[in-house]
Amino acid sequence: MSKSQISREFAAASEQQLKALCERRFDQTDILVVYIDGIPFGDCHVIVAIGVDSDGCKHVLGLREGSTENGRVATDLLNDLVERGVKPDRPRLFVIDGSKALRCGIDAVYGSRNAVQRCRNHKIRNVLGYLPEDQKDQAKCAMQAAFLLDADKGIQKLKQLAKWLEQSYPSAASSLLEGLEEMFTINRLGLPKTLRRCLGSTNVIESPNSGIRRRTRRVTRWRDHAMVVRWVAASLLDMEKRFKRIMGYEQLWMLDAKLKDLPVADAVDQEAKVA
């Protein structure tokens, strides 16, 4: 069998896998946590959503070509999840990168009665990107230590760090303070440390990301963005077969209870956010 024939057969198979993924329904699956992050492939970005049900099992929910910073793409992905059964009729925890467009999309599509946790790994990388090498370790350790504290104490510690950074590294200070409250959502919910370790970042997506790159390392040329999306879909579905339940899944009932206690957003406030 020639290489070109193998390539055509794989393209056809991966197209079917992508179609199957995009048509999945979750009406009978109680999705409690939704992780959303982007995977870059050169000039192409793919947004991936992975859900965790109330038993701690992971599910590949969907994907879209585009960046999380693209408001229309992010909202399209969220609307697609709603259409396929991840309805806005129950509060959830969304764990996302630092994208403002994605954050706004969650309120617009799912309403304000949801908890949003921003990825701490993204925040650390963003802040360190503004610092010289000799300052990175100290800042990283300070941030990681603050994340272990109660929400109010942790926020206060990072505000102190930002005040210190402001003197010489104002961009790092600004990056640190952006979205600071939502860095501590899981702390404010009073969740146990074991569960917080898994809910504080988008590692649930970043780990499959490394697996996708291993599977695609032999690809020397991406013909188009459609090829990237097909490969990502095929790789995710293959890895999903070996997904394990998240760490601390036995304590997810606590998250469920905390989410159900969240106040229902005022209708006027909700309309303003959607607008």
Q: Where does each model-flagged region fall?
A:
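Inter-helix linker motif
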Residues: 111-129
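Acidic/histidine-rich catalytic cores and adjacent linkers
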Residues: 145-275
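A generic short alpha-helical patch detector that favors 3-5-residue windows
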Residues: 41, 66-70, 94, 116-119, ...
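RNase H-like nuclease fold core
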Residues: 2-95, 100, 104-108, 112-113, ...
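Conserved phosphate-handling catalytic cores of large alpha/beta enzymes
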Residues: 124-153
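Alpha-helix N-cap/helix-initiation sites
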Residues: 3, 117, 221-225
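Solvent-exposed alpha-helical segments within well-ordered globular domains of core cellular machineries
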Residues: 4-12, 72-79, 83, 104, ...
